[in-house]
């Protein structure tokens, strides 16, 4: 009679309208990024900035690169951008007319801004980069290729090498992210670079980071190191040596090696390989590897934790890499033969990890 005498299971907790709304918001999460993309494509932020003061909807419509603009369509888009806290909405003429201006985050949508995120927005939301997210299930098997490779038939690096326009957009996007990050890196970690006589920026893209470091520390002999097709398209960099190559095969010798936003792209085995090459390239007594990457705190309620977890999923889907915890970094560096390391939080999503041979 056991089952008959058992007390009934507690009733399932009732689902609230708030729960449903949360799930709707998640389902339509792509609306945020694609409304943002549309705003960038038609130059809404630039039009607002170039206007003399706040702009009305009619003024905005008149300046769009589109004929016969639907005022209702535009209003609903702008209303959503207001909800996303990208655009500020105010009223004038006794409250009968709405006018719009940019909030601070909206300035990142300006094409000519030093820290513009326009290339990153356009690159990450273009169709090819959206395909991989539909192949997450196929990536679950052990030993499987990435979701990107499942969807596109090649890994992300082969794709970028074979698509110069997308490669340029990717590197411009990274450069925009890099400008803000590098400024913070230099301001918060001057002692990391002072005293160095030479530095190689591995996977340095178009040279934005190494150029800023050289300008801040002109006594350092600086080298940009990346794949041949990337180096060929890098900025003009006076006083900085450019070396094409493959970090999995060799790394130029220097007192210090910089790996900024590199290791999160790769598996642990690949990272150990890269780090061993870096260790071989630096002097045992005075050398170091400077890693700039996320140090993930999985249980933290920090305001940046969700962003860091999103970046981890991005790595999972597109590169096969990961964002790592402090323990992950310790294990990785020990496997690569480094005797010690220290992790320093900075005013950024990433931290600075200095590893000593």
From Swiss-Prot:
Keywords: Alkaloid metabolism, Methyltransferase, S-adenosyl-L-methionine, Transferase. Coiled coil: none annotated. GO terms for biological process: alkaloid metabolic process; methylation. S-adenosyl-L-methionine binds at residue 226. The active site is at 264 (proton acceptor). Optimum temperature is 40 degrees Celsius. Homodimer. This is 3'-hydroxy-N-methyl-(S)-coclaurine 4'-O-methyltransferase 2. It comes from Papaver somniferum (Opium poppy).
